[in-house]
Curated annotation (Swiss-Prot):
InterPro entries hit by this protein: TNFR/NGFR_Cys_rich_reg, TNFRSF10, TNFRSF26_N
Keyword presence, Hydrolase: no
Name of the gene encoding the protein in the UniProt record: Tnfrsf22
Identification of the protein by name: Tumor necrosis factor receptor superfamily member 22
Residues on Cytoplasmic side: 1-20
Keyword Cell membrane recorded: yes
UniProt xrefs under CDD domains: TNFRSF26
Length: 198
């Protein structure tokens, strides 16, 4: 009885092994045409001249900025059917996209400086009183720094740069000294001039 059981387990194991091998072989065979198709696409896409793209076994001319490919060409080296970008979408360059790109939206702490058009995205900047904290992330607006009382502002805050404060304190005595220094030089010069003329 034990021998029969071992024989049954052995034949079942072989059957499962063969079944797995056949399944793997079938998957490889099914995948082969797909790999050949990708290889052909890569090969042909390199043969299309600049400004053209590969579609349905032919090279087609790109659509111009502000449009997208509605239907590819059927005759080699011609342009397919291009359609103008719908409102709220754009393409900046000649392309072979099947849809235009959605326009950006300004964040709540930004204001629009240029609206989206068929050929350019919407341009936004930080609102008045805010500046871009990190140029790598233009959406990160921060409140402008206010210089402490008595410290002069060297550069006002704008949408791209924070306020720059002077490193020296603007003291009323310093201003008085700066005003009186040229005045005292003038008085001394007049006195010396009068003495010399006598």
């Amino acid at each position: 009885m034990f021998g029969f059981f071992c024989s049954l387990v052995s034949s079942l194991s072989r059957w499962f092994l063969w079944r797995r091998l056949l399944l793997l072989l079938l998957l490889l065979l099914l995948n082969l045409p797909l790999q050949v198709k990708f290889a052909m696409l890569e090969l042909h896409s390199f043969k299309c001249p600049a400004g053209e793209y590969w579609s349905k076994d032919v090279c087609c001319k790109n659509c111009s900025a502000g449009t997208f490919v509605k239907a590819p060409c059927e005759i080699p080296h011609t342009q397919g059917q291009c359609e103008k970008c719908h409102p709220g979408t754009f393409t900046e360059k000649d392309n072979y996209l099947d849809a235009c790109i959605l326009c950006s939206t300004c964040d709540k702490d930004q204001e629009m400086v240029a609206d989206c058009s068929a050929t350019s995205d919407r341009k936004c900047q930080c609102r008045t009183g805010l500046y871009y904290y990190d140029p790598k992330f233009p959406e990160s607006c921060r409140p402008c720094t206010k210089c402490p009382q008595g410290i002069p502002v060297l550069q006002e805050c704008n949408s791209t740069a924070n306020t720059v404060c002077s490193s020296s304190v603007s003291n009323p005595r310093n201003r008085l000294f700066l005003l009186l220094s040229p005045l005292s030089v003038l008085i001394v010069s007049v006195v010396v001039f009068r003495i010399i003329r006598r």
